Swiss-Prot record:
Gene: Su(H)
Species per Swiss-Prot/TrEMBL record: Ciona intestinalis (Transparent sea squirt)
GO cellular component: nucleus
Described function: Transcriptional regulator that plays a central role in Notch signaling, a signaling pathway involved in cell-cell communication that regulates a broad spectrum of cell-fate determinations. Acts as a transcriptional repressor when it is not associated with Notch proteins. When associated with some Notch protein, it acts as a transcriptional activator that activates transcription of Notch target genes. Required for the transcriptional expression of Brachyury, suggesting that it participates in notochord differentiation.
Protein name: Suppressor of hairless homolog
InterPro entries: Beta-trefoil_DNA-bd_dom (IPR015350), BTD_sf (IPR036358), CLS_fam (IPR040159), Ig-like_fold (IPR013783), Ig_E-set (IPR014756), p53-like_TF_DNA-bd_sf (IPR008967), RBP-J/Cbf11/Cbf12_DNA-bd (IPR015351), RBP-J/Cbf11_DNA-bd_sf (IPR037095)
Length: 554
């Protein structure tokens, strides 16, 4: 049977031997398990001969930017998992789900089928596990769909971890390419839902406004009857197959019903007004008051924090005791009955009782820019932020994130930048000259915006969804090779290097004042960073590794 390979540490480059071992797992036995065979290793070696590493060309990047054939893998899961004791198996609920998005999957499938001459070569196989050697990985059955669920995963009490991550292993069949191993976000292990009144001391179990949750209903505690709140074809429904992620927003009590609404920060408490918005479609339910459930009653005066795996009810605000309820696959309104003996309770049916749990997702996007590769695409780098240092000819960009390796380059649009690997969390690159993107830039006054991507040395593209904006401004042009010297290992400039002098002055609009200059006006590029529409002005000094290395005129 197939046992999981351990993922490499962030930024660690896998050895060829490890990749050969990983590729060997693509041979299948008749029982659906996997075995390592010499023929599989030989097949992987022949794959390296067939798909040698190819450096990404400018034309290939230009084609990608025009028509991205991305492959996106999403691992959707709950933030907490209930531990199983003894021989019981408390399967994760909602079950972890894997989505394959983008045209790149079908494109790669077609390429492999054509080149190998068999449909098996294009078949994608996936396995999932909890990252433990005690438990075998389970096969995920895609069956031509773009999603699948792992319905029988659990964690036993013999596993002493307080947190864990799911591992997904993917490869193409017929001795084909190993896609790689992908991790989920971190999952917290809990023993059982707390029945005590919660406090914010256990904030990691509470649910904050603006976070994502899943809601499911289980009639008479039967696992087979579990249904999940989901949006499909523009309608809310109760699905037994797919579950949806919903942003839960806290509202002011006096907030009126509207498509646009103001949200409040803080943790969700019972008795408060909330809004549930589908993360995928943006569809929202009317204003709801979340109420605590005790057996088959909704408690009207409960005000403690909502906690993981609590049962709750959703009263439709300003209605006559109407609650969000399911009836088989339909979502309906159910009218509760006042409790005759307890005025602070209303009687509801099983369909109006929902279990709430926080959710998370890990998302990976990549593209084979030069065609199929023999090496896995993992580790997939993840960019968190960009920081511009300096300006003019010496502008440098710090790329901050995780899972960086030394074989990555930063690309500005279709231009590869000189890049220096600093660590698994940081890259440093020189901002290319604006003339590389636009001819005659000296006579163009508008800004030029280009996407930022990371590219591996075998042509694999990792999009960042971030952009960089060049903003030409008038002024004398600077000439200083210090940035290239830094990257190419030349002598480091003195920390006390004086600023480059700038003749003349600028008026309030930023235009040069020609009467104060002895030289004619020449354009100067001062790149400004624009991430999601928020410009960040360049800093006057570039600080790298804690040393003030270069000053430029501001």
């Amino acid at each position: 049977m197939y046992h999981p390979h351990h993922l490499p540490a962030h930024g660690q480059v896998q050895s060829h031997q490890h990749r050969e071992d990983a590729a060997a797992t693509s041979s299948r036995d008749v029982n659906g398990g996997l075995s390592v065979t010499e023929s599989a290793i030989a097949s992987f070696r022949s794959l390296r001969e067939k798909y040698p590493p190819k450096k990404l060309t400018r034309d290939a990047m230009r084609r990608y930017l025009k028509d991205p054939n991305d492959q996106t893998l999403i691992v959707l899961h709950a933030k907490v998992a209930q531990k199983s004791y003894g021989n019981e198996k408390r399967f994760f609920c909602p079950p972890p789900c894997m989505y394959l998005l983008g045209n790149g999957w079908k494109r790669k499938q077609q390429i492999l089928e054509e080149e190998e001459g068999s449909s098996e070569a294009g078949q994608l196989h996936a396995f999932i596990g909890i990252g433990s050697s005690e438990q075998e990985m389970q096969q995920l059955h895609l069956d031509g769909k773009n999603f699948c669920t792992a319905k029988t995963l659990y964690i036993s009490d013999t596993d002493k971890r307080k947190h864990f991550m799911l591992n997904v292993k993917m490869f193409f069949g017929g001795g084909g390419a190993d896609v790689g191993q992908f991790s989920s976000k971190r999952i917290k292990v809990i023993s059982k839902p707390s029945k005590k009144k919660q406090s914010l001391k256990n904030a990691d179990l509470c649910i904050a406004s603006g976070t994502k949750v899943a809601l499911f209903n289980r009639l008479r505690s039967q696992t087979v009857s579990t249904r999940y709140l989901h949006v499909e074809k523009g309608n809310f429904h109760a699905s037994s197959i797919q579950w949806g992620c919903f942003a839960i927003h806290l509202l002011d009590d006096d907030e009126s019903e509207s498509e646009e609404f103001s949200v409040v920060d803080g943790y969700i408490h019972y008795g408060q007004t909330v809004k549930l918005v589908c993360s995928n479609t943006g569809m929202a339910l009317p204003r709801l008051i979340i109420r605590k459930v005790d057996k088959q009653t909704a408690i009207l005066d409960a005000d403690d924090p909502v906690s993981q795996l609590h049962k709750c009810a959703f009263y439709l605000k300003d209605t006559e005791r109407m609650y969000l309820c399911l009836s088989q696959e339909r979502i309906i309104q159910f009218q509760a009955t006042p409790c005759p003996k307890e005025t602070n309770k209303e009687m509801i049916n099983d369909g109006a009782s929902w279990t709430i749990i926080s959710t998370d997702k890990a998302e990976y996007t990549f593209c084979d820019g030069m065609g199929p590769t023999a090496d896995p695409v993992t580790p997939v780098p993840n960019v968190h932020s960009l920081q511009l240092n300096g300006g003019g000819d010496v502008a440098m960009l710090e790329v901050n994130g995780e899972c960086f390796t030394s074989n990555l380059k930063v690309w500005f649009g279709e231009i590869e930048a000189d890049t220096m690997f600093r660590c698994a969390e940081g890259l440093l690159c020189v901002v290319p000259d604006i003339s590389a993107f636009r001819e005659g830039w000296k006579w163009v006054k508008e800004s030029v915006q280009v996407p930022i991507n990371l590219v591996r040395n075998d042509g694999v593209i990792y999009p960042t969804n971030l952009t960089f904006t060049f903003t030409p401004e008038p002024g004398p042009r600077q000439h200083c090779p210090a940035a290239l010297n830094i990257l190419h290992g030349s002598k480091r400039p003195s920390a006390s290097m004086p600023p480059t002098p700038v003749s003349g002055s600028e008026d309030d609009s930023g235009r040069g004042n020609e009467s104060d200059r002895g030289d004619p006006i020449m354009p100067i590029k001062r790149p400004a960073l624009d991430v999601h529409g928020r410009p960040v002005a360049p800093e006057a000094a570039a600080t790298m590794n804690g040393a003030n290395m270069l000053r430029t005129a501001s």
